[in-house]
């Protein structure tokens, strides 16, 4: 699929340019070896203006256009970059995890794992425990399946 390679090229470029991001959602489960499928790409990005400007600059090279204005993005903290493919972009400073707990981008980014692929490709992933916490926010059946996989992976790794 052509769009798949374009998405990979885009992710590679934002990584190499130093955009502060994490691949989240089911694509991150796949990156951890999970036997799941998805067509979606979701990223969580640092919402400081310089970081978002760098993301938008690179997106423009791929003719990816935000589906919301910058003002709307600042209010809602979620948007899509769209063209022949789309990427869901989340950019709140933190997600509320209930009981006063917060999952902040800065903390998740500081604990990130970097997955390495072919030809020098690298991608930022949340640490397994952080990905479990993010998946618990969804609590859909597929999120629960993903959590089971990640818990099993932790056991295998001895964590």
Regions found by a protein language model. Give the residues of each.
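Compositionally biased terminal segments of proteins
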Residues: 1-159
């Amino acid at each position: 699929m052509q769009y798949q390679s374009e998405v990979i090229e885009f992710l590679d470029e934002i990584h190499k340019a130093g955009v502060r991001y994490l691949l989240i959602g089911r694509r991150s489960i796949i990156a951890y070896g999970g036997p799941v499928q998805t067509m979606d790409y979701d990223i969580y990005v640092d919402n400081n203006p310089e970081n978002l400007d760098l993301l938008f600059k690179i997106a423009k090279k791929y003719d990816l256009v935000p589906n919301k204005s910058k003002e709307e993005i600042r209010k809602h903290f979620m948007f899509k970059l769209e063209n022949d493919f789309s990427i869901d972009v989340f950019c709140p400073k933190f997600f509320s995890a209930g009981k006063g707990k917060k999952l902040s981008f800065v903390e998740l980014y500081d604990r990130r794992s970097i997955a390495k692929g072919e030809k020098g490709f690298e991608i930022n992933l949340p640490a397994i425990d952080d990905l479990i916490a993010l998946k618990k926010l969804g609590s859909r059946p597929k999120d629960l399946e993903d959590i089971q996989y990640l818990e099993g992976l932790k056991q295998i790794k001895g964590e």
